[in-house]
A protein has these predicted regions:
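Transmembrane beta-strands of outer-membrane beta-barrel proteins
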Residues: 57-65, 109, 114-118, 147-149, ...
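Solvent-exposed loop/turn segments connecting transmembrane beta-strands
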Residues: 124-134, 166-173, 194-204, 225-233, ...
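Outer membrane beta-barrel
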Residues: 46-71, 77-80, 84-196, 207-213
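Outer-membrane beta-barrel architecture
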Residues: 11, 47-49, 102-104, 141-143, ...
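Outer-membrane beta-barrel pore domains and translocons
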Residues: 64-66, 119-123, 152-156, 190-195, ...
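Detector for outer-membrane/organellar transmembrane beta-barrel domains
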Residues: 184, 201-308
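N-terminal periplasmic/intermembrane-space "pro-region" immediately following the signal or transit peptide
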Residues: 1-64
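Outer-membrane beta-barrel "beta-signal"
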Residues: 4, 18, 240, 313-315, ...
Length: 347
């Protein structure tokens, strides 16, 4: 055998071996592209697309520490030597902490924006010896365009700037509401379940609102009728940009105590939020209550008034503090000074 024949035979054998190995080789699959979270700016800041969907989600909340002061700020403590009701005591101050988290999901449909909203509070307070920390559903509702159904804050929850005013009784219900939003003009109606607020287990209430705004001035006219008590309330609220702040004025009247308002037959409240700097705001306020409630179904002849101030200071981005000091004087009652100091981190 010649050297040439030997070399050719060896080369052919190597080629055959390489071909067989190539046929049996395992080829790694190409990695699938990773889908990163995308920012959604269709509904404002803070939203992102849920991966694999066209639904935008926003997660928010706050952590709050607050110390309140005033008569019976904590009134369900028992002395360690005796846990009976006869030895119940009270305190003129109370501290608590709260964590709040919300989930807001939105998407566009042929009927308008579809929203699903859920928020919960996690409260920690040692107001009783056993402790009363609890979890509370703050809101849970579905909204499609102007139609809203679920558990949410009603139009009665809107108040004045600061912490002085009280212009709503029960402000959160399981409701079905519709609001027409024409920009500078709004009108809406709500059917509310008044569970635990009237004479029956499941009462029904109806609320209606008309709102208008022109430039820096806005006005709300709100009414509510409690079908169980067969009584109603009307309320007006004016807000106007004035100088370096916002002036607000509210007035309300009730035929008799009902689920929407029960403190007094009529009341007038006002506040002015003075924006001293970009970080500091000072809000004095006052309110007068005419013919205070004296029974479940009627008003009496006593009056009351309240005045106070609220100070807000933005420490840094996402961290702020609020101090509230209020004074109240009621006919045939003790004068009271009350308020709180709050530290809150928003996210």
């Amino acid at each position: 055998m010649s050297i040439r024949s030997l070399l050719l035979g060896s080369a052919a054998a190597l080629a055959a071996t390489s071909g067989a190995q190539a046929a049996d080789a395992i080829v790694a699959a190409e990695p699938e592209p990773m889908e990163y979270v995308r920012v959604c700016d269709a509904f404002g800041t803070g939203y992102f697309y849920i991966p694999g969907t066209e639904t935008c989600l926003k997660i928010g909340g706050f952590i709050r520490f607050q110390t309140a002061f005033g008569p019976d700020a904590a009134d369900s403590r028992y002395k360690q030597v005796d846990s009976t009701g006869a030895d119940r005591s009270s305190s003129d101050w109370d501290a608590f902490s709260r964590a709040y988290i919300s989930f807001d999901a939105k998407s566009d449909t042929e009927y308008g924006t579809l929203t699903g909203f859920f928020a919960a509070e996690f409260n920690a307070d040692n107001d009783t010896d056993a402790g009363d920390s609890f979890i509370d559903v703050d809101e849970a509702y579905i909204q499609l365009g102007g139609l809203k159904a679920g558990f949410f804050y009603s139009w009665w929850d809107k108040g004045l700037n600061g912490e002085t005013d009280s212009i709503g009784n029960n402000t959160e219900f399981n409701s079905i509401a519709y609001l027409y939003d024409g920009g500078s003009f709004q009108a809406g109606v709500s059917v509310d379940e008044l569970e635990g607020t009237s004479t029956k287990s499941n009462g029904v209430g109806v609320s209606g609102i008309v709102s208008a705004s022109v430039g820096g001035v806005s006005f709300d006219l709100l009414g509510g009728y409690d079908t169980e008590f067969e009584e109603g309330t009307i309320r007006g609220l004016l807000s106007a940009d004035l100088g370096p702040g916002v002036f607000q004025l509210a007035g309300l009247w009730a035929s008799n105590p009902n689920a929407y308002w029960a403190r007094s037959e009529w009341s007038v409240a006002a506040s002015y939020r003075f924006n001293a700097t970009d970080k500091l705001a000072i809000t004095p306020g006052a309110q007068y209550f005419g013919s205070l409630q004296d029974s479940l179904t009627s008003f009496g002849s006593d009056d009351a008034w309240r005045a106070g101030v609220t100070v807000d200071y933005k420490i840094t981005e996402g961290l702020a503090t609020r101090v509230s000091v209020q004074y109240e004087d009621e006919d045939n009652g003790d004068d009271q000074v009350f308020g709180f100091v709050r530290l809150q981190r928003d996210f």
